[in-house]
C-alpha cells in the first residue's frame, strides 16, 4: 500500500473532522468550514464528505488538504503524522 491507501484505510472522514475541530452532530452532520455555514449542511460519511450548501466534496485527504490549504500529498503526510 502507498501513503494515500494507508491513510484512507486507517482514518475516517469523521475522525479527521473531529480531530481538526469540526463539531459533528446527529446524522454525521457538521457546519461546513468552507463557507459561512450556521446550520449543519456537511454530511460526513465513512469514506467521503459532501456539503449540501456549497458542494464541497472529497475524501479524508481532500478534507484535510482544504482545511489546511495543503497539497494532497502534504495532507496525507499530516494525517499519517497525526494519526
Language-model region placement:
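N-terminal structured subdomain of primase-like DNA metabolism proteins
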Residues: 1-83
Amino acid at each position: 500500500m502507498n501513503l494515500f491507501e494507508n491513510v484512507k484505510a486507517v482514518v475516517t472522514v469523521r475522525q479527521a473532522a473531529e480531530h481538526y475541530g469540526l463539531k459533528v452532530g446527529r446524522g454525521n452532520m457538521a457546519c461546513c468550514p468552507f463557507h459561512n455555514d450556521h446550520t449543519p449542511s456537511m454530511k460526513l460519511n465513512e469514506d467521503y464528505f459532501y456539503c449540501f450548501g456549497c458542494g464541497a466534496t472529497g475524501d479524508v485527504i481532500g478534507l484535510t488538504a482544504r482545511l489546511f490549504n495543503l497539497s494532497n500529498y502534504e495532507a496525507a503526510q499530516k494525517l499519517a503524522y497525526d494519526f
